[in-house]
Amino acid sequence: MAIAHLATEYVFSDFLLKEPTEPKFKGLRLELAVDKMVTCIAVGLPLLLISLAFAQEISIGTQISCFSPSSFSWRQAAFVDSYCWAAVQQKNSLQSESGNLPLWLHKFFPYILLLFAILLYLPPLFWRFAAAPHICSDLKFIMEELDKVYNRAIKAAKSARDLDMRDGACSVPGVTENLRQSLWEVSESHFKYPIVEQYLKTKKNSNNLIIKYISCRLLTLIIILLACIYLGYYFSLSSLSGEFVCSIKSGILRNDSTVPDQFQCKLIAVGIFQLLSVINLVVYVLLAPVVVYTLFVPFRQKTDVLKVYEILPTFDVLHFKSEGYNDLSLYNLFLEENISEVKSYKCLKVLENIKSSGQGIDPMLLLTNLGMIKMDVVDGKTAMSAETREEHGNQTAELQAMNIDGETKANNGEKNARQRLLNSSC
């Protein structure tokens, strides 16, 4: 019995989740995959286009070209270019063929893209500092408790198995039909009011995190729509050239007769900027439905992650179905995102697959039988060693008996020889 008890300890200790020496859940993902994809594209694309715009500026060298008279030196021509480039946002110094054309949009196009990139990074930044720490602590607690629930189930199976071994419950008629019920009645104290279940139920009445999540998604959608409006308007200017007329007669040059009244100028990078605006506009238009989809992701009533824990007793997943928008629906999504960190989920998923294989095998009964198989193997080895020791004992006893018989015969022979010598001497 002691050997069987020790074997049971080894079997169930293999299934218990080991406590790691280093901190658990180091790589928790505190942002949903679809949200992270939206952030990377919405923020990364403008930064990429800005780098291309500045690379084009470095390769060309100047963003404006003005036609100066041949009598001007290169310093005077450079002054005209610089003056007209600085006066792009001043309407009183410019006259365009297309009327009041906002030429400053061309000048500040890279910086406006940078502004949109910064604005689109604000919602994820707010989420990281306002909501992520709270979700991180809650997820660690929930996942640790889920592992503990699994461990308690293994301990309960061990307790039930030990009780059956001590009391001979296996010989009671009808125990096979009621094995699952009696198994958990023995260790009911292990499962009274699982704290993780009660904690998750409280999230159905909480809306703090879901409000922050929806606010971030709405803000992202609004910024993307504003960016699409700006890029669409900028692209509509493609039919208008970047040519304009600039006057530099101001200050000491106002009465200078050698300076022409107007200079014909052209913005060189307009064509490149319009191409970049088309690329950014197309990507943002395709990205907007994805952001709308993220608004409805928490509305999904999915509890697939927790459903596998229905194998364990008293863990009622049906009560975890969220009704509308609440924190519970958000926690379900983040549990699904970090399910690879939960070791008990992997083990229970294997048992669930065995259960759904159609063979009619109860996973917990299979777990108990697995312990019995291990104990049978150990008992078999013990029985074989006992038989071997018995055979060795029998062989030793036979050898000892043979030695005793040999010594007796030798002593009798010596006595007979001495008697014959005495008789002959007489």
From Swiss-Prot:
Q: Which UniProt keywords apply?
A: Calcium, Calcium channel, Calcium transport, Cell membrane, Disulfide bond, Endoplasmic reticulum, Glycoprotein, Ion channel, Ion transport, Membrane, Phosphoprotein, S-nitrosylation, Transmembrane, Transmembrane helix, Transport
Task: Tell me where it resides.
Answer: Cell membrane; Endoplasmic reticulum membrane
The similarity comment for this entry is: Belongs to the pannexin family.
Q: Which InterPro entries match?
A: Innexin, Pannexin
Disulphide bridges, residue numbers: 66-265, 84-246
TM stretches of this protein: 41-61, 107-127, 218-238, 267-287
The PTM entry states: S-nitrosylation inhibits channel currents and ATP release.
Record protein name field: Pannexin-1
**Protein source organism:** Pongo abelii
One Pfam family name is Innexin
Locate the Phosphotyrosine modifications and list their residues: 199
Cellular component GO terms, alphabetically? endoplasmic reticulum; endoplasmic reticulum membrane; gap junction; plasma membrane
Q: Name one GO molecular function term.
A: monoatomic anion channel activity
